[in-house]
UniProtKB/Swiss-Prot annotation:
Recorded coiled-coil stretches: none
Single biological process term from Gene Ontology: pollen exine formation
Identification of the protein by name: 3beta,22alpha-dihydroxysteroid 3-dehydrogenase
Keyword Transmembrane helix: yes
Reactions catalysed according to its record: (22S)-22-hydroxycampesterol + reduced [NADPH--hemoprotein reductase] + O2 = (22S)-22-hydroxycampest-4-en-3-one + oxidized [NADPH--hemoprotein reductase] + 2 H2O + H(+); 6-deoxoteasterone + reduced [NADPH--hemoprotein reductase] + O2 = 3-dehydro-6-deoxoteasterone + oxidized [NADPH--hemoprotein reductase] + 2 H2O + H(+); 6-deoxycathasterone + reduced [NADPH--hemoprotein reductase] + O2 = (22S,24R)-22-hydroxy-5alpha-ergostan-3-one + oxidized [NADPH--hemoprotein reductase] + 2 H2O + H(+); (22R,23R)-22,23-dihydroxycampesterol + reduced [NADPH--hemoprotein reductase] + O2 = (22R,23R)-22,23-dihydroxycampest-4-en-3-one + oxidized [NADPH--hemoprotein reductase] + 2 H2O + H(+)
GO molecular function (one): oxidoreductase activity, acting on paired donors, with incorporation or reduction of molecular oxygen
Protein role: Catalyzes C3-oxidation steps in brassinosteroids biosynthesis. Converts (22S)-22-hydroxycampesterol (22-OHCR) to (22S,24R)-22-hydroxyergost-4-en-3-one (22-hydroxy-campesta-4-en-3-one, 22-OH-4-en-3-one), 6-deoxocathasterone (6-deoxoCT) to (22S,24R)-22-hydroxy-5alpha-ergostan-3-one (22-hydroxy-campesta-3-one, 22-OH-3-one), (22R,23R)-22,23-dihydroxycampesterol (22,23-diOHCR) to (22R,23R)-22,23-dihydroxy-campest-4-en-3-one (22,23-diOH-4-en-3-one), and 6-deoxoteasterone (6-deoxoTE) to 3-dehydro-6-deoxoteasterone (6-deoxo3DT, 6-deoxo-3-DHT).
InterPro entries: Cyt_P450, Cyt_P450_CS, Cyt_P450_E_grp-I, Cyt_P450_sf
Tree of life domain: Eukaryota
Transmembrane segments: 1-21
Disruption phenotype: Dwarf plants containing severely reduced levels of castasterone (CS) and brassinolide (BL) and of their precursor molecules.
Gene name, Swiss-Prot/TrEMBL: CYP90A1
Main location as per UniProt: membrane
Length: 472
């Protein structure tokens, strides 16, 4: 018994000594202060545990209070520099491809495919990013997509019964919109079948990338294979149609097929897979949380209704929204901004240092990961007054923030700025217009937000809806 106790004491002393040596070595290297946590595991479990709750902030708050806004930690198997500092985040984003490169978990890389926009680098990424933006800019939305967005929103809302799972309905809308934009398909059995496979793919993003040990990942890989097979059929059929002289459609697939140096079917499929994820998951979550936050803030909901009822009063019974209507929704844009700030659908981005990098007096070693946390900045009271309160009126002020001008980054920044940011704003604005002018609603159950593996409500936000008398 005494010998066992002695061994435990000796082991504790040895572990403490090794920890002290490690801290001393890192201090001499000029690394930011922090803790690497337990061997191999690091602080991953603490992070996941916090983000599976409605209030994950303590994980960041405690470390910022102790170490400062840039600190060292160990996440998902790798030493990581965590930045809750807007200037550091901007530096990381702007130096994409120079000092830093994108770096994501193996599960995400495998499920998206090696030719996805997220994983492209250098000149190819620049070219494909520009191509993607050309199909989602203001001019394209105004001239081509606005009517499609409005039509698809109305099509889905017309099918609503008394009780709906809002997050599921929002996912249908955004998926159908993305499929239409990319491949010119209207809603139907094919798109709904594809969407259900996508649900499984997304569930596997933050799973252990070992099919033998992770059922979630295994199902995700199988679903990804089915998605790729379905998209390959579409690509091959479109190639045949164009070779036979069919009129070229004005969508992303047509642009990819017409590219000067040509893309293989596999490259096009990977590209489409990633764009479907990007346009589907994030925008649908923003829609759901905008409604949740508005429901919990009656004054904001009342002002939003007033703005949209003025637009509706100028229309005929059966009307379509136009670009000019979107541009006359100032308070709606305040709601959109505040939803993006509070919800933080994209909580941050991982990058990897391509060389030794010095910033703010600290050294980031080559090969180390950096996590630029948008969430930490957006919810920092040093940058936004009452930062953790949903307050869309703050965006009516000419001086929204109390800190530097680069603190609001819901769509990232630098060369990897989200190419669909304007399309997401328009889709949410149109959805809110049709919802508040066509329905009243109340929550069917209490529902909570969680933030891992993605931002979502636990129960998919069930609501009871009632059609308003003048709805068309």
């Amino acid at each position: 018994m005494a010998f066992t106790a002695f061994l435990l004491l000796l082991s504790s002393i040895a572990a403490g000594f090794l920890l002290l040596l490690r801290r001393t070595r890192y201090r001499r290297m000029g690394l930011p202060p922090g803790s690497l946590g337990l061997p191999l595991i690091g602080e991953t479990f603490q992070l996941i545990g916090a983000y599976k709750t409605e209030n994950p902030e303590p994980f960041i708050d405690e470390r910022v209070a102790r170490y400062g806004s840039v600190f060292m930690t160990h996440l998902f198997g790798e030493p990581t520099i965590f930045s809750a500092d807007p200037e550091t985040n901007r530096f990381v984003l702007q130096n994409e491809g120079k000092l830093f490169e994108c770096s994501y978990p193996a599960s995400i890389c495998n499920l998206l495919g090696k030719h996805s926009l997220l994983l492209m680098k250098g000149s190819l990424h620049k070219r494909m990013h520009s191509l993607t933006m050309s199909f989602a800019n203001s001019s394209i939305i105004k001239d081509h997509l606005m009517l499609d967005i409005d039509r698809l929103v109305r099509f889905n809302l017309d099918s609503w019964s008394s009780r709906v799972l809002l997050m599921e309905e929002a996912k249908k809308i955004t998926f159908e919109l993305t499929v239409k934009q990319l491949m010119s398909f209207d809603p139907g059995e094919w798109s709904e079948s594809l969407r259900k496979e996508y649900l499984l793919v997304i569930e596997g993003f933050f799973s252990l990338p070992l099919p033998l040990f992770s059922t979630t990942y295994r199902k995700a890989i199988q679903a990804r294979r089915k998605v790729a097979e379905a998209l390959t059929v579409v690509v091959m059929k479109r190639r045949e149609e164009e070779e036979e002289g069919a009129e070229r459609k004005k969508d992303m697939l047509a642009a990819l097929l017409a590219a000067d140096d040509g893309f293989s079917d596999e490259e096009i499929v990977d590209f489409l897979v990633a764009l479907l994820v990007a346009g589907y998951e994030t925008t649908s979550t923003i829609m759901t949380l905008a409604v949740k936050f508005l429901t919990e803030t009656p004054l904001a909901l009342a002002q939003l209704k007033e703005e949209h009822e003025k637009i509706r009063a100028m229309k005929s019974d059966s009307y379509s929204l136009e670009w000019s209507d979107y541009k006359s929704m100032p308070f709606t844009q305040c709601v959109v901004n505040e939803t993006l700030r509070v919800a933080n659908i994209i909580g941050g981005v991982f990058r990897r240092a391509m060389t030794d990098v010095e910033i703010k007096g600290y050294k980031i070693p080559k090969g180390w990961k950096v996590f630029s946390s948008f969430r930490a900045v957006h919810l920092d009271p040093n940058h936004f007054k009452d930062a953790r309160t949903f307050n869309p009126w703050r965006w009516q002020s000419n001086s929204v923030t109390t800190g530097p001008s680069n603190v609001f980054t819901p769509f990232g920044g630098g060369p990897r700025l989200c190419p669909g940011y304007e399309l997401a704003r328009v889709a949410l604005s149109v959805f809110l217009h049709r919802l508040v002018t066509g329905f009243s609603w109340v929550p069917a159950e209490q529902d909570k937000l969680v933030f891992f593996p993605t931002t979502r409500t636990q129960k998919r936000y069930p609501i009871f809806v009632k059609r308003r008398d003048f709805a068309t």
